[in-house]
Amino acid sequence: MEEEKILESDLRHISFVMPKYTPIEKIGEGSFSVVYKALDAESGRYVALKAITRTSSPARVLDEMMFLKTLGGRKNCMGLLGCFRNEDQVVAVFPYFEPIDFREFISNANLADIKRYLHNLLIAIEHVHSNGIMHRDLKPGNFLYNKESGRGMLIDFGLAQYEEYSEGQHAEGGAKPAGPLLFFNSVVSKTKPPGYYERDGRPPMKAPRAGTRGFRAPEVLFRCQRQTGAIDMWSVGVIFLTILTTQYPFFYSSDDIDSIVEIATIFGHAEMRKAAKFYGRVWRSNIDSIPEERIPFETIVESLNPWAEVGSDGYDLLYRMLDLCSSSRITASDALSHPFFDDLKTHENCA
């Protein structure tokens, strides 16, 4: 079969693990790795083989293995069964976890399903953050969820980092330049028609830019050097909004410029000015699609998914996750204690 020929060609570079593991099919592929479902010849169980690309930084690979050793196998974080190396090729072995397709999940998830999904994800994030680590690439593809069992697994710690700043520093806001810096599209063009935006000609601030477009927090887009686990909670909020609206992806931006504009079309100029000031930036724009005041999440959800079951507690949690200012954004620990999950916890206690 053609599929087998392609599979054999793909697997030549990891043939050194094939005496022990028999690859069955490719189940995932990213910028830095390819993942295969395989059979463990010794145990007879399925496993996932993650073949890390040769172009990956050795330090990055080592860091990922370190984070997996620290976090894996507990609190909904994927465990590491083993790791093999042959010259510059690394293959990590994980338990195989059968997830539901995210698009299928959001197409028919009820409120109880949504609560279980988010609760599982938050348990993993709280575990990560309690160890002083930021995941930095939260998105549906990195959280495997099995609807039948009601269990989820956080995967891919390739971009994870330890937090470098204390809570006190974090609360002060973002990077503090000597003078106000206009961010990307915030320069108002005097020679172009309304709605036009252009780049600030000055050199951009250098700061960590991990994550996937559409899930990056405002402080990442504003190029702030002080970043904490709050960036993960923004990503959880985007996932929550995506589920409620059934729009995946919710943000379609192709780059950071478009990303901040998309956020601004929801939050409005007034909120963007406050956030920019918090991060030591200046926000100005004459783009017609950006309102002065924010559009309520209730309006967005009801217009895109009139049948959505959310409730006041659900919206409150959504607002606290998608808070433009990182210091007041809800933490994973506090989110787990939010009233939105009260009936879920009561049900679990009675089970």
Curated annotation (Swiss-Prot):
Reactions that this protein is recorded to catalyse: L-seryl-[protein] + ATP = O-phospho-L-seryl-[protein] + ADP + H(+); L-threonyl-[protein] + ATP = O-phospho-L-threonyl-[protein] + ADP + H(+)
GO cellular-component term (any): cytosol
Domain of life: Eukaryota
Family matches, as InterPro entries: CK2_alpha, Kinase-like_dom_sf, Prot_kinase_dom, Protein_kinase_ATP_BS, Ser/Thr_kinase_AS
EC primary class: transferase
Protein's GO biological process: cell division; meiotic cell cycle; regulation of cell cycle
UniProt cross-references to Gene3D superfamilies, sorted A to Z: Phosphorylase Kinase, domain 1, Transferase(Phosphotransferase) domain 1
Domain Protein kinase as annotated: residue spans: 21-341
Protein EC: 2.7.11.1
GO molecular function: ATP binding; metal ion binding; protein serine kinase activity; protein serine/threonine kinase activity
Residues annotated as binding ATP: 27-35, 50
Cofactor(s) the protein needs: Mg(2+)
Residues the record marks as active site: 137 (proton acceptor)
Keyword RNA-binding part of the UniProt annotation: no
Keywords (A to Z) from UniProt: ATP-binding, Cell cycle, Cell division, Kinase, Magnesium, Meiosis, Metal-binding, Mitosis, Nucleotide-binding, Serine/threonine-protein kinase, Transferase
Protein family membership: Belongs to the protein kinase superfamily. Ser/Thr protein kinase family. CDC7 subfamily.
Function, in words: Serine/threonine-protein kinase. Needed for the initiation of DNA synthesis during mitosis as well as for synaptonemal complex formation and commitment to recombination during meiosis.
Name of the molecule in the record: Probable cell division control protein 7 homolog 2
Organism: Encephalitozoon cuniculi (strain GB-M1) (Microsporidian parasite)
Gene: CDC7-2
